[in-house]
Amino acid sequence: MTQLRQAKYRQDYQAPDYTITEIFLDFDLDPAKTKVTAISKVKRLNPQSSTLELFGEDLTLISLEVDGKAWTNYKEESGKLIIESLPEAFTLSIVNEISPEKNSALEGLYVSGEALCTQCEAEGFRHITYYQDRPDVLARYTTKITADKSRYPYLLSNGNRIAEGELDDGRHWVKWEDPFPKPSYLFALVAGDFDVLRDEFVTRTGRKVALELFVDKGNLDRAPWAMKSLQNAMKWDEERFGLEYDLDIYMIVAVDFFNMGAMENKGLNVFNSKYVLAKSETATDKDYLNIESVIGHEYFHNWTGNRITCRDWFQLSLKEGLTVFRDQEFSSDLGSRSVNRINNVKVMRAAQFAEDASPMAHPIRPEKVIEMNNFYTLTVYEKGSEVIRMIHTLLGEEMFQAGIQLYVHRHDGSAATCDDFVQAMEDASNVDLSLFRRWYSQSGTPVLTVRDEYSPEKQQYTLHVSQMTPPTADQAEKQPLHIPLDIELYGEDGAVIPLKRDGSLVNSVLNVTQASQNFVFDHVTSRPVPSLLREFSAPVKLDYPYTDAQLAFLMQHASNEFSRWDAAQQLINNYAKINVEKLHKGEALVLPEHVVDAFRAVLLSDNIDPALAALILTLPSENEIAELFTVIDPVAIHNAIDFIHSTLANEMHDEFLTVYRSIKIDGYRVDHGDIALRSLRNTCLQYLAAADDRELANKLVEAQYRSADNMTDSLAALTAANEAGLPCHAELMSDFDDRWHHDGLVMDKWFTLQGTNPAKNTLEKVRELLNHRSFSMTNPNRVRALVGSFTAGNPVNFHAEDSSGYQFLYEILVDLNTRNPQVASRLIEPLIRFKRYDAKRQDLMREVLEKLKGLENLSGDLFEKITKALES
């Protein structure tokens, strides 16, 4: 295991001494023992070298030949096969064996249900055969697969199917050819028996592309939405980005056992079934929108990731940040831009900001990595996307698209860097991004402090803006960044005040580039109310001393819907902080009438999108509130939020009931109007369930559950009963279990409710459910739903002072450490942030981390996080 302990540094990048230009892979498939033959055309790049280093893990080497002759000049050491005394160009033939059924880590070739499938990103290909498993080695792949026809009637790989045949022994074979050079992480193979949904897409140049969606037998009725989403994504990428699909066929396979969400393998995407399967009885509105987003994300990788890939894994955000931006734009263009923006920002504030403040803090382009799987993070993906969005804000759509076209023209068919992308944007737009580049190298969440002054005599309004990024675990020193600050000013009547300076109109996006700057605006006839950081124009924390009255004003008058929501969030945040302090002092909790009135006005407004109203009325999560504090008190935060929730529920009870009863929706459709109405109606139900009138709450919730004709409404009722601990809760949960226990994806929703239940006996219940008929520790979706929801989504119970939550996670991690290190590494996150808590909890969590560190075969995934946490 020693090779897993060695850190790699971005600055140490060296091009390979040799590269592989073509590879022929021949698989003789069997779950117990699969024979892999790899025949590669290799050529020297470094004239000084005659040694080829290949990576290989858990492989049995059978034979090795160079130009058709047995080659003995090689050695195996620490996960590498080092072949020496090689000529300038040669054909390398390697035969090895692997055992897919023993592969519980789900990296490389493994068993998922009755099928065989692969996951090769980041470094999974080395679990299939010996290879230069690095993203800057791009080869053309031809793949032949042979297997038992009755067991595996479908044999799939990248590219186009070029030949197939049958053998006398009941087996058959298929040969695939991918004409586009690609790195090994984009290789894919799937073998199994599926139901197939077939359709086509005609590109803008008139080419017909066959579309095939493979799902488990019996799930065909849950595939049409994913197919529609794929066609929408292909059309959108042509219209918005001018990018057209390049193969004759595009395939998606849904599998139940998958560590990630989905994988963009060239022409053959492998998806977690969670992001493919949907029908109204089993999937919620959120599921439908997530499927649309993830289908889009993986398709968009065809250009931003596959045709242009990463030079090395430190550049991961080059493909992921850009592609997340693209999938967010896709969802925004097809649905509600403001709702999508708000949901993206909620992830940033609740989870990415927490990552910045953790021992695993890193820039979007990391400098140092031990286990690459640990850097598929919210920072690389979500913050990476915010960095791309800032470039879009600074350049505008037209220049941004010119930059994309230049980037594609320069780098198509190659492995590029983040610097290459920024350079293309700069060259296409003539906008200086030299200071902006610091976003790629500097970690942490900047704090933007804004103060203002108004001069009635001069009719001038001045914003004093300063920026500061607190030190992070990986960087002590911080420098000023280029921060686009989008603002708007309002007069007392709610009208927008034009931004003017020296007689000219000023752009609403202010360029904050120094540690402190002043921005002066003329012809401002009265003191304005500023709307700051509109659209969340930069991934920063804002410090401006808004009064309650100003926030209520913005909730009503801000022209930007995100800003209306953000004002409501800040108002609640203020009282969450006030009430946590009051709890510490033993004082009575408060939520003034004017705050309730501000929220009542939103609920009763006739000119607001119901989806926006629902989001404004939805309180920040306990994890979001936690980010407001230096030292997190999970019990006080829970009680403060609970108080605010129940106060609004009781004070606005009649209004919630009126709106709840007034919303009628005929049938189930996936369109923004209906989704918006359902979300507002179900938000009202959550509040009604939390009110003092328990009898009415129980009646309403049970009635909705019993009459629901779709999973969105059914689950909303169950969630309301779960959070409020209503009398009907146990019976409804039992009914749901009886109805859906055979369906893993639906049961994940039920397991998540069990894990997030605020009741004091939740951990006891979670432990019992580890033996539930629908639960399996071998399935990452089940583990995330039950265990992950408790450890990451139920802070008041996970952080119980008796350490029971920490001990539970310890036991789970010991199990997963060898079974599936990637899933273990995700689950450990709440523990490694122990320094955010009080001294007692810190000691208890540190104790668990020390015990884990002492495990005999601690995986590299866990070792890296535990070590960083204990050393921070």
Residue ranges: model-predicted function:
Residues 1-35, 110-119, 126, 131, ...:
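N-terminal, polar/Ser/Thr-rich
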Residues 39-58, 130-133, 139-148, 419, ...:
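Surface-exposed beta-strand/loop patches in extracellular or lumenal glycoproteins
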Residues 45-112, 133, 169-170, 174, ...:
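A surface-exposed beta-strand-loop module
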Residues 60-67, 432-435, 445-532, 649, ...:
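Beta-strand-rich binding/interaction modules
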Residues 95-198, 561-564:
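Extended, low-hydrophobicity, Ser/Thr/Pro/Gly-biased non-transmembrane segments
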Residues 98-105, 470-471, 536-541:
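Short acidic/polar inter-strand loop motif in beta-rich domains
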Residues 176, 204-458, 462-465:
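Hydrophobic alpha-helical and helix-loop surface patches within well-folded domains
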Residues 350, 377, 522-872:
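Long, ordered, helix-rich scaffold segments
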